[in-house]
Amino acid sequence: MEENFIEVEGLRVRYFEEGSGPAVLLLHGASLGSSADVWTGNLSDLAARGLRVIAYDQPGFGLSDNPEDLSVAYRTRFVLAFMDAVRLQKARLIGHSQSGRIAVRLALEHGERVPGVVVLATGSLLPPLPGRGKPDAAEGEEGAAAEPTLEDTRRLLEENVFDKSLITPAVLRTRLRMSTGKNFRAFLERSRARGGEKKESKRESKPLWQRLGEVQSPLRLIYGRQDRGHAAERAALAMRLHRGLDLHLVDRCKHLVQWDAAEEFAALSGSFLAEKT
């Protein structure tokens, strides 16, 4: 696995890369402390399946620069800019949590550049349960009002991981590093900007979960059975509403699917993206 930096739209961006073959971009979520580091335990397994795997720190996360625009819309456009910078005309996308929305939107609007999508634990791509309202307003943006301590970071990870033994001292140190300083400032700015994004989303004629059938690229969704927001119940509802939807539930697995179910994730994603797209 190589760690590199590249300039994209005037921002210095860190990324990891491993393997050769069809290109796959791994897009991390938006909770405090998220970065490309959430994928480092998965790159080798995916690369071994004949894929060129790239995971980058999105703007405002990890070791990448903070942009002026911290909106989800900007980070969606930035995926294409990053692809251009690393000279990828096409790339399969794996989006975790909030970034599953990014991946699906790009497949809808730029399908010629996105020949396949895997969604991990994106609650907003599941229908709400009747009478429960909308549960994903701040999807994947969990954090803290004050810069977190090591114990704050541990608690946040424990909410998202079924197997607590995965939260090693090294993992905690990295997560805390990615949760403080310029990344915490970016988190606060994203929180303040969220109101404007809600107004914009209300203008859309249909939520993305109702548009999954419009995605022309091969699409697979993977959720942890023990994830928050009644994910298992809503996944079952999604499969009833969308006939033929390629959706998988993994047991003993919470929100960080790529950690709790690393082998299942690699098998389900690697074979799907290498063979069917």
Regions found by a protein language model. Name each.
Residues 226-230:
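Acidic catalytic loop of the alpha/beta-hydrolase fold
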Residues 148-213:
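Conserved alpha/beta-hydrolase catalytic His-Asp/Glu region
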Residues 215, 221-223:
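Short beta-strand/loop motif that positions the catalytic acidic residue
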Residues 104, 108, 115-155:
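Flexible "cap/lid" loop of the alpha/beta hydrolase fold
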Residues 40, 48, 55-94, 109, ...:
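Active-site loop/oxyanion-hole signature of alpha/beta-hydrolase fold enzymes
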Residues 95, 99, 103:
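Gly/Ala-rich beta-loop-alpha elbow adjacent to hydrolase catalytic centers
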